[in-house]
UniProtKB/Swiss-Prot annotation:
The gene is hyd1D. Glycans are attached at N36. The keyword Transcription does not apply. Transmembrane segments: none annotated. Keywords: Cell wall, Cytoplasmic vesicle, Disulfide bond, Glycoprotein, Secreted, Signal, Vacuole. It comes from Beauveria bassiana (strain ARSEF 2860). This is Class I hydrophobin D. Disruption phenotype: Stimulates conidial germination and virulence via insect hemocoel colonization. Does not affect radial growth and multiple stress responses. Belongs to the fungal hydrophobin family. Disulfide bonds join C28-C68, C39-C60, C40-C52, C69-C85. Induction: Under normal conditions on SDAY medium (Sabouraud dextrose agar plus 1% yeast extract), hyd1D is increasingly up-regulated during the period of incubation. Hyd1A is the most active at transcription level under normal culture conditions, followed by hyd1B, hyd1E, hyd2A and hyd2C in order. Residues 1-16 form the signal peptide. The keyword Hydrolase does not apply. Aerial growth, conidiation, and dispersal of filamentous fungi in the environment rely upon a capability of their secreting small amphipathic proteins called hydrophobins (HPBs) with low sequence identity. Class I can self-assemble into an outermost layer of rodlet bundles on aerial cell surfaces, conferring cellular hydrophobicity that supports fungal growth, development and dispersal; whereas Class II form highly ordered films at water-air interfaces through intermolecular interactions but contribute nothing to the rodlet structure. It is found in: Secreted; Secreted, Cell wall; Vacuole; Cytoplasmic vesicle.
Length: 89
């Protein structure tokens, strides 16, 4: 039981660890700094803006809006620092 919990915790930590941004991901300029283009779910009022995924496929899914986010060097599957984002028109 302890081994299973340790394995699950380790796997969760590896999945959530920061990674290099995908090579096909767009870059943008926000507040004078280079940022990443991210897609946020606009259908979920608060949580959708806080949990955004880095744009990897070139387009956002339906119900998502494109944002330019200053990730501050923290890139991964989920960008929690959506406070530093500007919506792209």
């Amino acid at each position: 039981m302890k081994f299973s919990l340790a394995t699950i915790a380790l796997a969760a930590a590896v999945v959530a660890s920061p990674t290099n941004p995908p090579t096909e991901a767009g870059s943008c300029n926000v507040k004078g700094k280079t940022g990443n283009v991210t897609c946020c779910n606009s259908a979920i009022p608060i949580l959708g803006q806080l949990l955004c995924n880095v744009l990897a496929s070139g387009t956002c899914n339906s119900g998502q809006s494109a944002y330019c986010c200053d990730t501050g060097g923290n890139t991964g599957l989920i960008v929690v620092q959506a406070v530093n984002c500007v919506e792209l028109l």
